[in-house]
Amino acid sequence: MAGSSFGKSFRVTTFGESHGAALGAIVDGVPAGIPLSEEDIQKYLDRRRPGTSSVTTSRNESDKCRIYSGVFGGLTTGTPVMVMIENTSQRSQDYDELAITYRPGHADFGYDSKYGFRDYRGGGRSSGRETIGRVIAGAIASKALDMLGIKVQAFTQSIGNVYAQSLNLDECGENAVYMPDKDAAMRAIELIKEAKSDKDSLGGIIGCIATGVMPGLGEPVFDKLDARLSAAIMSIGAVKGVEFGAGFHVSTMTGSQNNDPFYIDEDDEGLHIRKRTNMSGGILGGISDGSPIIINAAIKPTPSIAKEQDTVNAINEEVKLEIKGRHDPVVVPRAVVVVESMVAITLFDMVLENMKSRMDNVLKVYKDKI
């Protein structure tokens, strides 16, 4: 199966299936000298771990990670970093009836059409547990970005028709849905419980803000920063749309409303070019402009629902289906760290790519050694 690797200079390969023995990631291109421990990675994994609240799946996996290579004495060595976790709470018997039945909204039919064979236990490679490898790599990328003063933070913008009305990012970790608005979070939790009681599910929007990003990241024409970020986020199974800055609202604006006016700002470090607004979401012409990068990702409702649905099977019979097993009534809260990770992976990859864009970057590294 091709398509399990992402990135150029910071190359991430994920492996494993939902009901297989283990999952993880191999990350190549990690510079030597980044402080990294299993605890650093575990903090990220715990944010997507199942079984942590009433609004997530009851599948209770510890998701404890182990670093197998690429780290010595608490620092990355410059060799590929391999991190793996073991699956411990599979209940594969819950999926026996799905061996030949196609679940609506899932990848079953597509996988059968492409490969003529599929791992039907929890979706196999198309399961949300595949994102464990992304979060591992995202934790590593975030450690590197921290050293550059770049911070990436994702959060729940909405669940169903409940939207956050404020952006108090410190409140995200204080509620089960990672919303930056505690009042909206309470309403969202009640809405999730209603959907769960109805044997149904919900979707939502995940927002992400990256601050401290230097101007100049992005490679014209086909590797624009927003193009690479879009590809990264759209590769997450539950994501159905991505927008930057004002997003689709720009279609209703005039040019004078959409254009971000520039001005000169002066501080102790000198003169800086700034923007008065940020309709562009921090990216102009596919290149970062130094403003915060603002992203929204649309997340579809969880397709695994207990409500009866019409479907077909592999022997061309129309059948009724009520999905058993342990599933999230909404994946948005657990997908927050996945979106955050894909943004961090992409930004650090582009930082490394950008090192070769100018000769003075090369001279800063090598001039004293010549």
PLM region spans:
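N-terminal, positively charged regions that mediate nucleic acid binding
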Residues: 1-59
